[in-house]
Amino acid sequence: MADVYPVDPAFAADARITREQYATLYRESIEHPEQFWGKAAQRLDWFKQPTQIKDVSFALDDFHVRWFGDGELNASVNCLDRQLATRGDKTALLFEPDSPDSPSYPVTYRELYERVCKLGNALRNLGVKKGDRVTIYLPMIVDAAVAMLACARIGAVHSVVFGGFAANSIADRVIDCQSKLIITADEGLRGGKKIPLKANVDAALKIPGTNTVETVLVVRHTGGAVDMQAPRDRWFHDVVDGQPAECEPERMNAEDPLFILYTSGSTGKPKGVLHTTAGYLLFASYTHEVVFDLREDDIYWCTADVGWVTGHSYIVYGPLANGATAVMFEGVPNYPNVSRFWEVIDKHQVTIFYTAPTAIRALMREGEAPVKKTSRSSLRLLGSVGEPINPEAWRWYYEVVGDSRCPIVDTWWQTETGGILISPLAGAVDLKPGSATLPFFGVQPALVDAEGKILEGATEGNLVLLDSWPGQMRTVYGDHQRFIDTYFRTYPGSYFTGDGCRRDADGYYWITGRVDDVINVSGHRIGTAEVESALVSHPKVAEAAVVGFPHDVKGQGIYAYVTLIAGETPSEELHKELVSWVRKEIGPIASPDHLQWAPGLPKTRSGKIMRRILRKIAENAPDQLGDTSTLADPSVVDSLVNERLTR
């Protein structure tokens, strides 16, 4: 089996960036960042051209990150208005519904522009002003993109909440950003099942602290019956349809907020990652164009949900700013059958396909036949995102899905980074299965040891970034101190990613996974603290500890150790009740895969839970527990090892 897949000369001959260009541009981006990003800023349309390009300090006593600080622009103008002259009739979004029996349809740039303007006017009429926060809780439908761009047009800050989150998670996010308006739908559709979106919003708005919400706009999607409370609830079409199809865009400073997106942290509640207008939009569009080697006639499909950052950057902002055609898929990979992805590729003649290793591993289990019965001959480039892809899944993706003729861009980045930071460029970089390979322009990765010493050469350590890039998050909304403490205090002067990483002799980067208390489940980050606090909030639970363990399909699964209060006994019923309790508190993505009853948890004499030991037990590696002599009661470990569920 090949360990290196050299650049295909035929691909390279036509590629946007060649090997030589990559080396030259990367060097310029590191040695002369102002010059490099000043030129790159010309990708955007500005009301006022920036003269200040980079103003950055990671020093704890003078921390600031500003890019293009005196520039003025509007993100929706860059995604829509500037496309109208030459691409007005081009398809911007190609909607593919949950069921293949429902109609798919294209939305042109001109239609999208008009829909965005109408909603922008409606939001202004409802009192939404520049800087107000709007929560978007929608399925994967075109109106989700319309809602995001309409907020951007009038200078409102959108906070998109993934449609799989439950009422408590919605309420947490609404309360944290003091949202003024919510845009939702009657119901979502996913794999043939209905998701009660409006009912979830109703439940969320009964929770104390959510009373900043004045209006709920409801998209009629499935036509399902929902409870409408006047005057708070309004039908989306009633408010939007009569509006003018022109809407004056707000002039935004480069550093004005564009959106907040909540992501799991290693402690407590989710944090609101705040991205600003110019740097984010520039970085999303630039990475999208270069990493995916974009052409004017590409049909590009990213299978993510807009509720995650991948959907923000690589379905909405990046592709539309580039005038691309993006597929928007409401469904799931295995409904109504496990050929669905490949059937959609053939139906729409998709040329670039970007999905998560979890989906690849799940479909790989179904064998080659469901793939081979489709053509996929339109494909020219494949991408992977969300978590490290194991070499076996990489090879299957390359050989079976891409017929050994499509390069794979294995992209590493985070909600916090706004866009792709480490990835091969298909015309410039040889591929290695499982490696994210080399950094994008302007990105300076380094590996450090536990003390923060920079490690040279082929080695393994914690991944940090030595300098800023335009797509970098600017703060945790409403909690700047948490931002500094989380990302910049561990290794002063650097941004700490929270990921471990190996660098090989060729300088290629191999992401090894989180080194903090965050689990990467199917490419979605789940904080162990969130799941623990959900479990402990159940009246019968005294204590809980949650760790990740290797999972064949999801990458990592959730393993929970639960200690019940005195007088309660474990049962199959209580097991089911606790799993559904977590689903209700957070959402289905946080459901524990294993829940082990624990008479006690391994603690130090000072009362700290030794998660390292729990991790090894969950990984079925009881011979690697290390020193347990510091535990208050070492016998606890023996009983946990004997009862472990992953043997």
From Swiss-Prot:
Annotated EC: 6.2.1.1
GO cellular component: cytosol
Gene Ontology MF terms in the entry: acetate-CoA ligase activity; AMP binding; ATP binding; metal ion binding
SUPFAM superfamilies: Acetyl-CoA synthetase-like
Alphabetical UniProt keywords: Acetylation, ATP-binding, Ligase, Magnesium, Metal-binding, Nucleotide-binding
Post-translational changes noted in the entry: Acetylated. Deacetylation by the SIR2-homolog deacetylase activates the enzyme.
Residues that bind CoA: R190, G191, G192, K193, T310, N334, S522, R583
GO biological process: acetyl-CoA biosynthetic process; acetyl-CoA biosynthetic process from acetate
Cofactor(s) the protein needs: Mg(2+)
Positions that bind Mg(2+): V536, H538, V541
PROSITE patterns per the UniProt record, alphabetical: AMP_BINDING (PS00455)
Binding site for ATP: G386, E387, P388, D410, T411, W412, W413, Q414, T415, D499, R514, R525
UniProt-listed Pfam families: ACAS_N, AMP-binding, AMP-binding_C
Similarity comment: Belongs to the ATP-dependent AMP-binding enzyme family.
Function field: Catalyzes the conversion of acetate into acetyl-CoA (AcCoA), an essential intermediate at the junction of anabolic and catabolic pathways. AcsA undergoes a two-step reaction. In the first half reaction, AcsA combines acetate with ATP to form acetyl-adenylate (AcAMP) intermediate. In the second half reaction, it can then transfer the acetyl group from AcAMP to the sulfhydryl group of CoA, forming the product AcCoA.
Protein name in the entry: Acetyl-coenzyme A synthetase
Originating organism: Xanthomonas campestris pv. campestris (strain ATCC 33913 / DSM 3586 / NCPPB 528 / LMG 568 / P 25)
Gene symbol of the encoding locus: acsA
